């Protein structure tokens, strides 16, 4: 159950204070509210979406062995690893470790043991990658 106390923002639409129980937010897959389309096996919990700010806060879960190819998007994202393992840019990241990405190519991201992250997007969260990148990457990290 979300606890809410609305207050009108001086800058426009109403913004709401939220304290949210994780157990009350369902995991979603496939097409997520028209905000993003997920590959098979990947799931998200949308915690907050502000269409005015174009800010999307969510938890994202990747299955063991999943590889996200080198990509870019029309936004920045900030990622905090909360469970499991994320391997990127020669680093083996664990809970508490952080990643920042912008509109320049980054990745691939590998999840050899599976992983859960907290991620914030500012702008369009759609990922853009070359089709060849989807096929040519080989996992370099072992479970």
Positions of predicted regions on the chain:
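A short, N-terminal "cap"/entry segment at the start of jelly-roll beta-barrel domains
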Residues: 1-53, 133-143
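Small beta-barrel nucleic-acid-binding modules, principally OB-folds
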Residues: 54-63, 68-71
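Glycine- and acidic-residue-biased ligand/ion/polar-headgroup-sensing regions
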Residues: 63-64, 73-88
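Histidine-centered metal-chelating micro-motifs
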Residues: 66-69, 87, 99-108, 126
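Ligand-binding loop in jelly-roll beta-barrel domains
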Residues: 92, 103-131
